[in-house]
């Protein structure tokens, strides 16, 4: 017997029709904050398959052909048809929830990038006073440290951050399910305005250095983790250019304490005075 569950991320509801009873409760528990009663845009059929085991490591990853995306990992094999908004995934129960998370994360990434003109950033998103501050950098740059040094703030994610245009002159950051990253605090399943962005630089001093547009693009630009034949490099650059033209971006030198928030608050006040 199949059971249907609809979840919504970044304003996109999808239904998951899960075959059998064994994994219905853990899936509902994992995605409960993102449950939705809206009509789904995508329909995904999910089948446990005890015999599934990907032996050929060269087949692992994402491929795109004729409007269909195939996603293969150690314990899953799935596809998305972007022409009729349907998908199918088979998962070995030995790694069910984690494998489903891999597929769903990639699915929403594709939707955000291909349908919303959005971007997916390797960053930590911190919600403070109903506005989001995004801190970027490679592994080891201090993203998790920033989250730990912000105990009174809500951490939307410290790994994958969904950003998309909101109106004509602003951007919104959306919460995502817990896909193996650190999250903290209660938040609503909606977009929050993106206030500032920071590229992290560990230092004994604490200060902000504003980026110009060209330098900012070169510092924060990353190629999205999707098949490149679905999106041109020119289009990706255009999206970063638009984002950084609207959202202030800085190199943030910080020590292992919370003083960087004082520097951010001073910069906020300075920007408010200029705008006023």
Locations of the language-model features?
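A noncatalytic interaction/capping subdomain that flanks phosphate/NTP-handling catalytic cores
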Residues: 1-138, 149-156, 161-276
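Hydrophobic positions on the alpha1 helix immediately C-terminal to the Walker A/P-loop
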Residues: 146
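Conserved glycine(s) of the Walker
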Residues: 141-143
């Amino acid at each position: 017997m199949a059971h249907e569950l609809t979840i919504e991320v970044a304003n996109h509801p999808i239904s998951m029709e899960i075959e059998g009873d064994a994994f219905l409760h853990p899936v509902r528990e994992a995605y409960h904050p993102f449950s939705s009663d809206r009509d789904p845009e995508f329909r995904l059929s999910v089948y446990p398959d005890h015999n599934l085991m990907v032996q050929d490591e060269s087949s692992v990853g994402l491929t795109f052909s004729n409007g269909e995306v195939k996603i293969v990992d150690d314990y899953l094999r799935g596809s998305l048809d972007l022409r009729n908004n349907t998908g199918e995934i088979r998962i070995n129960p030995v790694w069910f929830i984690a494998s489903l998370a891999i597929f769903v994360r990639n699915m929403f990434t594709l939707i955000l990038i291909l349908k919303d003109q959005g971007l997916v950033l390797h960053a930590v998103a911190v919600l403070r006073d109903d506005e989001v501050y995004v801190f970027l950098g490679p592994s080891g740059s201090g993203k998790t440290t920033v989250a730990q040094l912000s105990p009174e703030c809500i951490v939307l994610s410290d790994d994958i951050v969904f950003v998309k245009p909101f109106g004509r002159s602003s951007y919104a950051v959306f919460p995502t399910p817990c896909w193996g990253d650190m999250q903290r605090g209660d938040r609503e399943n909606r977009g929050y305005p993106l206030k500032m962005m920071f590229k992290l630089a560990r230092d004994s001093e604490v200060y902000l250095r504003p980026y110009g547009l060209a330098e900012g693009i070169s510092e924060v630009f990353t190629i999205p983790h999707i098949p490149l034949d679905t999106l041109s490099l020119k289009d990706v650059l255009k999206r970063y250019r638009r984002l950084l033209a609207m959202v202030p971006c800085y190199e943030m030198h910080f020590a292992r304490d919370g003083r960087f928030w004082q520097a951010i608050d001073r910069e906020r006040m300075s920007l408010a005075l200029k705008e006023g």
